[in-house]
Amino acid sequence: MADLSQIVKAYDVRGVVPDQWDESLAELFGAAFAEITGADAIVIGHDMRPSSPGLSGAFARGAAARGTGVTLIGLCSTDELYFASGSLGLPGAMFTASHNPAQYNGIKMCRAGAAPVGQDTGLAEIRALVERWADEGAPPPAATTGTVTRRDVLGDYAAHLRGLVDLSGIRPLKVVVDAGNGMGGHTVPTVFEGLPLELDAMYFELDGSFPHHEANPLDPKNIVDLQARVRETGADLGLAFDGDADRCFVVDENGDPVSPSAITALVAARELAKHPGGTVIHNLITSWSVPEVVRENGGEPVRTRVGHSFIKEEMAKSGAIFGGEHSAHYYFRDFWNADTGMLAAMHVLAALGGQQGPLSELVAQYDRYAASGEINSTVDDQAGRLAALKAAHQDRAGVTLDELDGLTVTADDWWFNVRASNTEPLLRLNVEARDAATADRVRDEVLAVIRA
C-alpha cells in the first residue's frame, strides 16, 4: 500500500524529488485533482526549480487523461497562480516548495476562485485516490482527452495589482528588492514597470539551486545581504520575497527589519480607509498593536488560530477585507481572500511615498511593544510541558488563559503563546510585553518550564 503520509501535509504536498515523489506520482495527483474537483478545466503554474516543469507537465497529463481541460501559465509566483484561479474561475495547482531547499518540490492546490484545498477541503480525498491508484493502477482514460493550452497571465496579474493600489502619484523611492533567485525575479520587473521607483535588483536570476542564500526571508541570515545593500546605497527601503514570492519581508532605510505585525497594522489602516467599518483577521501571535490599530481606524478585529486555512475560512465567513499573519502572509478580499506579499509591498510603497518621512518613522506608530520573536525548543513530551505551563499560571491573579491554539496566557502588561509543531518535536514560544525588560523576564520564566 502506497504511503503518502510523509509528503501530504496539512495544506499542500511537499517532499524530496525523486526520493519521496516523482513525475509518475505527479500524474496521479493530476488525475485525482481533476476527479475530486469535478472541474471541466484547471490552471497550472510552476516555479523555477529544476524539477518543476516535469512535475507540472505530468500533473497536466493526469488531469487531461480524465477529460479535464488544462491551461498552463508556466513560470509564475504562487499569488500569480491564485490570480489566474480567481480571474479565470478555475481550480489551480502551483508547483513549488516555497522556501524549502532545492531538492524539494510540492503542490499548492486551490478550487475555483483561489479557495484553499487542505486536509478538510479535498486534500485527504486526493491523497486516498492517489494511494489507491498507485497500488491498483491508474483508472482508464476518459473517452475524450482534455485540451492543453498555454496562456501568459503575468501582464494581467500586474495590471490587477496596480488597479488595487495607486502608486502613480508617490514621490520617487529607491527600493532594493532581494528575490533570492526565486519567482520575485519574474514578477517584480513587470509589476514595478513604469512606477516612480528606482529598483535595485538583487538575485533576480531564476535559479532553483538558490546559490546566494535560502529563499526564506523570515530567517535573519537570509536578509543580511539586503540589509547591507540598503545601508550602502541609502535606499528608502528593502523588500525580500520567498521562493514562490507569496510572502514579502520589509527592512527600513536603516536596514532594520520591520515586523510583519507592523506591516499588518499599516495595511489594515489603509484597507479600512477604503472599506470603512470592515473586519480584519489576525492570528493570535500577531502583536497587540494590530487589533488596536484596527479599532482606532473604525474596524473590527477578529483573532484566529495560526495557519492560512483558518485565516481564509474566517475571511470567507466574516467577509473580512484583510488578514495578516506574523509569518508575513497577507490576505486580501480584493484578491479572492488569497495571500499576496506583492500587494502588501505595494501598500508599503504607497504609504511611504505618500508622505515625506522615512519608513522607520512611519512604522513606529504600528510597532508599539517589545517582542521575543518565535523561539523553538525541542521537547519530547509536548503535552506534558504545556500542561505544566498551564498549571503554573492558571491560579495566578490578574492573568487569563485560553487554548484556541496551544496555550495563551495574558496579563495587563504581557502575553505569551506556546504551540506544538505539527511536524516536529518542538514547542514554539512567542512573548510580547509593554517593555523589553518584562518581555525578557517572561520569556526566561516560560523557557525554564518548557526546558525543565
Task: Go through each PLM region and give its residues.
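Short glycine-rich phosphate-binding loop at a beta-alpha junction
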Residues: 40-47, 71, 174-176, 278-284, ...
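Gly/Ser/Thr-rich active-site loops/lids in small-molecule metabolic enzymes
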Residues: 196, 201-203, 256-275, 308, ...
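Phosphate-binding and adjacent anionic-ligand microenvironments
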Residues: 237, 275-452
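Gly/Ser/Thr-enriched, mixed-charge loops and adjacent short helices
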Residues: 105-233
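N-terminal small/polar loop signature for handling phosphorylated ligands or for N-terminal nucleophile
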Residues: 42-105, 162, 190-251
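Active-site nucleophile and cofactor-binding loops and adjacent substrate-binding regions
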Residues: 70-79, 257-260, 282-283, 304-305
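An N-terminal, well-structured beta->alpha segment
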Residues: 1-61, 65-67, 91, 147-173
